[in-house]
């Protein structure tokens, strides 16, 4: 037919067999990519330190999605929680990856079969003998099947009745593990950070969808509605499907970027708003204050802070710090975290306790300023020494460490104090290995940032696709150029293929 590249999908119009074939092939590609990507990530993933080198620091993309559904173990004998496992069986990273690849192969063969055997009796209207699809009935079938799956996921998989449950953690991402979840049927179920809402909403949505599917299978649409919504046109199906996809993409952008029960920070990394609001900093300070109030010494109180919690309170783990054109995992930026050095407390020669003002998310450089408890600037690292009044040397600042690798150490020399003041500007102080991965010192974003950026773009493109195909199906007669001066016209709805000589024609009246 000599179609241009952007019109090639015309070949599956009014060809139900090959329409099924291309959908089978598309699903095969998706399943094959998912399985192959999982195997690739497993090949490069280092499970040795789940606290300071978790999967989101290593740039893993599909593994966090597997883990949140309950896949945490590997045939290699490790678990993402740091434990040793034996015989994880099929419900493991490798097992799930291989089942997707096997599924992909079977779908590939099915696609070929349907491409070859495209002209089935099933696709012909018994009254006319012409190709026809009962699209409202097909909609009912799809709605019923997807709703059964939705209900089953909420009622069995998430609740643990027949399945592992889902990833559940505390509000600070320290104690996460896979647990069965009880449905939350009250107002608390609408809290996006409550995993109980995942179970209850899938059960509720599945129930409504099953009823709606049965309705669409048993009740025919009114003729006026059928014509008004162009229910007989396959491009209507395409347009409405695209709208469902772009809406889902927009929603997942929000749940990923702002955080939710389905995007736990242990699997995808912290959100930028947790850095902006000092979320982890406040929790750490509260825990330290409570420990000191219970009689613990400051060094002991800080030593009780989990390394995992301290690591979240570091700007390099903020997904907004990585530029969109800086490819690679976080570890290729600041390096592989090796140890928490501890919490530095600065003092001037008058005994005032100073803290370093932290860098805001969207700054690449920021002045190093030390303030007292009242927010008054007492020391800094000056840009011009000649005019400095508050330099580390002039003010006589010292740095004392509590907790971590440097617990109990005090630094009096200005170069060391400046070094740790610069590090404290970025949150809690960590030691990084930048040699192993040849890390360049430039921050990268986490999978949370990449997912959001990608899906926001997909959603925008699909939004325009929805408008395009929706307009084409509603105003098809206008776009086709039907008018009084047209002497010969293709009869729409019989055959729409460009260049198809078998299309029925009618003369001008």
Curated annotation (Swiss-Prot):
GO terms for molecular function: chlorophyll binding; electron transporter, transferring electrons within the cyclic electron transport pathway of photosynthesis activity. It comes from the Eukaryota. Keywords: Chlorophyll, Chloroplast, Chromophore, Membrane, Photosynthesis, Photosystem II, Plastid, Thylakoid, Transmembrane, Transmembrane helix. GO terms for biological process: photosynthetic electron transport in photosystem II. GO terms for cellular component: chloroplast thylakoid membrane; photosystem II. It is a multi-pass membrane protein. Gene3D superfamilies: Photosystem II CP47 reaction center protein. One of the components of the core complex of photosystem II (PSII). It binds chlorophyll and helps catalyze the primary light-induced photochemical processes of PSII. PSII is a light-driven water:plastoquinone oxidoreductase, using light energy to abstract electrons from H(2)O, generating O(2) and a proton gradient subsequently used for ATP formation. PSII is composed of 1 copy each of membrane proteins PsbA, PsbB, PsbC, PsbD, PsbE, PsbF, PsbH, PsbI, PsbJ, PsbK, PsbL, PsbM, PsbT, PsbX, PsbY, PsbZ, Psb30/Ycf12, at least 3 peripheral proteins of the oxygen-evolving complex and a large number of cofactors. It forms dimeric complexes. Belongs to the PsbB/PsbC family. PsbB subfamily. This is Photosystem II CP47 reaction center protein. The lineage of its organism: Eukaryota, Rhodophyta, Bangiophyceae, Bangiales, Bangiaceae. The gene is psbB.
């Amino acid at each position: 037919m000599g179609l241009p590249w952007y019109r090639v999908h015309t070949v599956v119009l009014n060809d139900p067999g090959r329409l099924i074939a291309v959908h089978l092939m598309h699903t095969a590609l998706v399943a094959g990519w998912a399985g192959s990507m999982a195997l690739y990530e497993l090949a490069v993933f280092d499970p040795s330190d789940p606290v300071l080198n978790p999967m989101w620091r290593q740039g893993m993309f599909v593994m966090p999605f597997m883990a949140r559904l309950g896949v945490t173990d590997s045939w290699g004998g490790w678990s993402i929680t740091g434990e040793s496992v034996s015989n994880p069986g099929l419900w493991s990273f490798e097992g799930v990856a291989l089942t997707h690849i096997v599924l992909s192969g079977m779908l590939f063969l099915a696609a070929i079969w349907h491409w070859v055997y495209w002209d089935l009796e099933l696709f012909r209207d018994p009254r006319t003998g012409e190709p026809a699809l009962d699209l409202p009935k097909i909609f009912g079938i799809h709605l019923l099947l997807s709703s059964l799956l939705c209900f089953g996921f909420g009622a069995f998989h998430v609740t643990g009745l027949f399945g592992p449950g889902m990833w559940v953690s505390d509000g600070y991402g320290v104690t996460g593990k896979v647990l069965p979840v009880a449905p939350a049927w009250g107002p608390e179920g609408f809290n996006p950070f409550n995993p109980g809402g995942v179970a209850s909403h899938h059960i509720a949505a599945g129930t409504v969808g099953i009823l709606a599917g049965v309705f669409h299978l048993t009740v025919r649409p009114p003729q006026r509605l059928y014509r008004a919504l162009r229910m007989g046109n396959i491009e209507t199906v395409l347009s409405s499907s695209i709208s469902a996809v772009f809406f889902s993409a927009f929603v997942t952008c929000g749940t990923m970027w702002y955080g939710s029960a389905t995007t736990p920070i242990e699997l995808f990394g912290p959100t930028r708003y947790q850095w902006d609001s000092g979320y982890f900093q406040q929790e750490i300070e509260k825990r330290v204050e409570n420990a000191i109030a219970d009689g613990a010494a400051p060094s002991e109180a800080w030593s009780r802070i989990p390394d995992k919690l301290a690591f979240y309170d570091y700007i390099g783990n903020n997904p907004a710090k990585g530029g969109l054109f800086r490819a690679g995992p976080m570890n290729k930026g600041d390096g592989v975290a090796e140890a928490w050095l501890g919490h530095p407390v600065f003092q001037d020669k008058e005994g005032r306790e100073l803290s370093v003002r932290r860098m805001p998310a969207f700054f690449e450089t920021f002045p190093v300023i030390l303030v007292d408890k009242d927010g008054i600037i007492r020391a800094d690292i000056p840009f011009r020494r000649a005019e400095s009044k508050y330099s580390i040397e002039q003010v006589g600042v010292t740095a004392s460490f509590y907790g971590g690798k440097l617990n109990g150490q005090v630094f009096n020399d200005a170069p060391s104090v400046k070094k740790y003041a610069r590090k404290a500007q970025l949150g809690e102080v960590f030691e990084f290995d930048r040699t192993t991965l040849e890390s360049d010192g430039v921050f990268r974003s986490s999978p949370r940032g990449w997912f959001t950026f990608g899906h926001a773009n997909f959603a925008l493109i699909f939004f325009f696709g929805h408008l395009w195909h929706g307009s084409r199906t509603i105003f098809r007669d206008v776009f086709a150029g039907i008018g009084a001066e047209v002497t010969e016209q293709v009869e729409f709805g019989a055959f729409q293929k460009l260049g198809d000589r078998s299309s029925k024609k009618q003369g001008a009246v």
